[in-house]
């Protein structure tokens, strides 16, 4: 899988996977260039999670500890396109973790999902730094029992398809292993 480690990163990379599949760790290593032991480069982390309970606060603290202090962190649960514009000023690779929590936040805020996704895709057009997105693949499991659960699963599937269409590289993580699903050559 030598081509997965090729740098520079393509303009847009999407890292998908289930819970605890290794997607965040892999995406962090892609963004910093440290996937195969290289010295990490600076990067910007856009966090979409909100610490609404103790378990989520613990997860956020674990992610921060793993990343260390070299990252510039922008916390934005809803306005992802605006956060990308803020991150552009740093001129460094950007990691967005994760689209799934962003979608959940949008649904709870009763935002227009199509409009928010359109805004995100438009923000990527001509963006000046590589962007790595993390998203959950929620459509491989059981059918959710509730209408809201099914609506979320369907919306997540549509968002993932839209972002995969936009992405130059798509990686599916399973059991900590990357499976390259799409790899458009990096434009020089």
Tell where the protein language model's regions lie, with residue ranges.
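Conserved P-loop
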Residues: 2, 9, 13-86
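Residue-level signal for inorganic ion chemistry
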Residues: 27, 63, 95, 136, ...
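Conserved catalytic network of the ASCE P-loop NTPase/AAA+ motor domain
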Residues: 37-38, 86-89, 124-127, 164
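Helix-adjacent hinge/juxtasegments
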Residues: 66-115
